[in-house]
């Protein structure tokens, strides 16, 4: 994905131009073998691809995440209360909250941020757009609040937790691990 001038202007309009920003990304993935065995803790082989989700992100001084994806409404997520909410199942806001909750459960720092995102990983394409989005959110929290010190496996596990518990979709670890690690991966 590429950030266009229009998207940069949208980010400035929404979030201002007086803060330090990070530009972060997370790739989609392709399965090489074992996709459905992943749900049963079987062996799998997957790889990240050259299509990705990208964010321009900046810290906030509160426990609110404002995320604006290209072509979608603004997600305004209060992370001061991290309990899952069934009425949010299937929504991006649930993924955001779930990733943050997962990282907090692992003992990492969390906090609010503003992000303007875009993605070449199209929904429904079989390239794990939801995993790329979850890993992107975890990557933002990692760099804004944890100095980039959260390992790829923890990013993947927090993202899977989000998808399973907050988004309401059962999944193995294949999608999130391939996106988080960013190369060929085997899971056994």
Regions found by a protein language model. Name each.
Residues 1-131, 135-152, 157, 161-167, ...:
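ATP-binding N-lobe of GHMP and related small-molecule kinases
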């Amino acid at each position: 994905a590429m950030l266009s001038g229009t998207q940069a202007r949208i980010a400035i309009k929404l979030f201002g131009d007086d803060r330090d920003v990070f530009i972060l990304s997370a790739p989609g993935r392709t399965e090489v073998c074992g996709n459905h065995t992943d749900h049963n803790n079987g062996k799998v082989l997957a790889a990240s691809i050259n299509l990705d989700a990208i964010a321009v992100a900046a810290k906030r001084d509160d426990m609110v995440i404002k995320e604006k994806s290209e072509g979608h409404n603004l997600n305004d997520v209060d992370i001061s209360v991290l309990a899952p909410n069934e009425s949010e199942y299937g929504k991006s806001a649930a993924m955001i909250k779930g990733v943050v909750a997962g990282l907090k459960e692992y003992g990492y720092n969390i906090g609010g941020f503003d992000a303007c995102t875009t993605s070449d990983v199209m929904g429904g394409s079989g390239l794990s757009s939801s995993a790329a989005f979850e890993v992107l959110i975890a990557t933002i929290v990692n760099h804004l609040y944890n100095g980039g010190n959260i390992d790829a496996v923890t990013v993947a596990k927090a993202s899977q937790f989000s998808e399973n518990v907050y988004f309401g979709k059962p999944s193995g670890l294949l999608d999130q691990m391939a996106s988080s690690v960013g190369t060929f991966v085997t899971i056994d």
